[in-house]
């Protein structure tokens, strides 16, 4: 009666409120009337009323901002309504007492962790016990009546992602780790964990004990899996596995529903899903209100399955009502379709759809529920809905692809093996990858690589870049001279190489003398002269001259033919002048009479050594469209192209794309490479990645579980002796001692030993040192 009374008092609807900043975590109080929202820049308490959320208290007080307010997690005590705990990004664990009369509600500060604290958890029945897990790999248990931790737990592993006290076992808590392991601890024994098992491939981000079933523990990881483990037996057993759409950041069991749990993702997917673990491939319900990553979920009351609270990076706080959730099952296609790794197609449907009627008379015939027409229908009991669901059978058809079919995945393998991602200049990488895509009949990808080379290649002559400014007086250069002969030759050379699409003019030198100013140019049959950028094509003049010996008379060119230009202030149609900051050349009165140019000095007139404008747009100009292109490829499922371009472009585009999105692309591509057993390519992608979570994939420790060679029992991690037969494992066949370093064995007879001992033995004899008579060979 007490439970029903508490549930009946909870009323509400689907509602939301805007927050001041993105939320990292949320927690609800015991009576489900208030919720606390914590993040890097927010720490507030909101009241839950029928009309909406009402701000009750802002816990970020003080003139100077403190990192103690920058929260990675928050927990509201379920026995003491005025007590909260937060995990700070600076490694501090802070408790808050809402009953304090002053504005600052901070009560205790624990600074024993050296890195960010990821999780804090109160004991469900012990008021003064608080547990924390940190990036430093340690878990600490605090007694709130003391100023220091009472015990420290070292998992001998990487960072701790989540810690949860068991709802049924007073002394037990579970911890999930970055390396994919889950450990069970007894708070009375801080020296060693009680049990450890590998739950996921990759980090385990979250875990949650079932509120009713004593031994059920749900875990979620980066491998997009939610797994339910049975801890009540001597050996950990996986009983359910749910395949989600993205990495699982939070998992919470649904109250009053044994097989339901809620999950949210830490990247890509913004929705909240409620799963029935008995039907793991399609969500039972979906909440689609958030526009960015959901960071925290909590059921409003421990006995109410109809209200779910959530916070997100979109700076919103939502209360979801279960009747407003969308039901994917209602819209789902009852037939299944799936492509295999090598292009094979599998199709599953009900047997009634896959098999044709036996005869024409069977069409439209209805059968009795019991299936036997010898008895009246009232003798048969209508089957339960769950039984009907369990008894449904499907037929599976597999269509194998031909070897030369376009549906095959040979193009993926050949592309992964042929692409160059590093080791050469950027232009050569793009050109090589374009040829690879073209040879594999992928014209769109080939064109993409070619366009990337054009957009992001640097000019061949760095002196003609756009990093030049106006001179001090603000004047534009008077004349820019081009040698068409040299330009044509350069273009022909570039067309042969097919490497550059830029037009570079001949760089000239400006020499200043005391008496006059002369400009040396290159020889040519024709010189095209234009002043600034204001002349049209029909205003260009061609001046021809013949190469004459140096000893002939000089050409006298009147200065008044080229009057000095006035200062140009602002001209919207003219490009930005590209002249270095220096004073404009000044022509004195005596120098204004004439200027002397010799034939050997060409017919180039007063000019500058830089172009008026660069033929290249800055690379940042193309970043938005390249970002859209990468997202397009990823949405189409071609993560190979997205990741390859991301690696080749490097810092040119990396900052434009969200790091979590990059991590999702990398993980998807690496997963595909490993499915095709392209281990070398996978390792290269990991090494070239700039995401921290990806770079550490090939640096994680590798655990090899071995069995006893005598009784075949799995070896424990307590030593090198089998617990059952008391025989040593991995004994060297030569020296008969336990091998604790490099171990080499024969694949024919399975005998082996120390690497050095086996090498020395096989130099003298070809027979196995164990005496089995096998002819062993060391290669």
Curated annotation (Swiss-Prot):
Look up the record and give one Gene Ontology term from the biological process aspect.
Answer: positive regulation of macroautophagy
For whether the record's keyword set contains Zinc-finger, the answer is: yes
Gene3D superfamilies assigned: YVTN repeat-like/Quinoprotein amine dehydrogenase
Enzyme type, top EC level: transferase
Span of zinc fingers (C4-type): 707-729
Q: Does Disulfide bond show up as a keyword for this record?
A: no
Q: Where are the zinc fingers (RING-type)?
A: 730-779
Enzyme Commission designation: 2.3.2.27
Please provide, alphabetically and separated by semicolons, the GO molecular function terms listed in this UniProt record: ubiquitin protein ligase activity; zinc ion binding
Instruction: Return the InterPro entries for the record.
Output: WD40/YVTN_repeat-like_dom_sf, WD40_repeat_CS, WD40_repeat_dom_sf, WD40_rpt, WDR24
Which keywords accompany this UniProt record? Autophagy, Lysosome, Membrane, Metal-binding, Repeat, Transferase, Ubl conjugation pathway, WD repeat, Zinc, Zinc-finger
Residues of the region (Disordered) are: 506-526, 570-590
Write down the chemical reaction(s) this protein catalyses.
Answer: S-ubiquitinyl-[E2 ubiquitin-conjugating enzyme]-L-cysteine + [acceptor protein]-L-lysine = [E2 ubiquitin-conjugating enzyme]-L-cysteine + N(6)-ubiquitinyl-[acceptor protein]-L-lysine
Note how its activity is modulated.
Answer: The GATOR2 complex is negatively regulated by the upstream amino acid sensors CASTOR1 and SESN2, which sequester the GATOR2 complex in absence of amino acids. In the presence of abundant amino acids, GATOR2 is released from CASTOR1 and SESN2 and activated.
Q: Which domain of life is it from?
A: Eukaryota
The subcellular location is: Lysosome membrane
Listed under GO cellular component are: cytosol; GATOR2 complex; lysosomal membrane; vacuolar membrane
- Residues annotated to bind Zn(2+) 3: 746, 749, 774, 776
**Where along the chain is Zn(2+) 4 bound?**
751, 768, 772
Q: Which family does it belong to?
A: Belongs to the WD repeat WDR24 family.
Query: What is the stated purpose of this protein?
Result: Catalytic component of the GATOR2 complex, a multiprotein complex that acts as an activator of the amino acid-sensing branch of the mTORC1 signaling pathway. The GATOR2 complex indirectly activates mTORC1 through the inhibition of the GATOR1 subcomplex. GATOR2 probably acts as an E3 ubiquitin-protein ligase toward GATOR1. In the presence of abundant amino acids, the GATOR2 complex mediates ubiquitination of the NPRL2 core component of the GATOR1 complex, leading to GATOR1 inactivation. In the absence of amino acids, GATOR2 is inhibited, activating the GATOR1 complex.
Oligomeric form and interacting partners: Component of the GATOR2 subcomplex, composed of MIOS, SEC13, SEH1L, WDR24 and WDR59. The GATOR2 complex interacts with CASTOR1 and CASTOR2; the interaction is negatively regulated by arginine. The GATOR2 complex interacts with SESN1, SESN2 and SESN3; the interaction is negatively regulated by amino acids.
The protein in question is named GATOR2 complex protein WDR24
**What organism does this protein naturally occur in?**
Danio rerio
Gene name, per UniProt, is wdr24
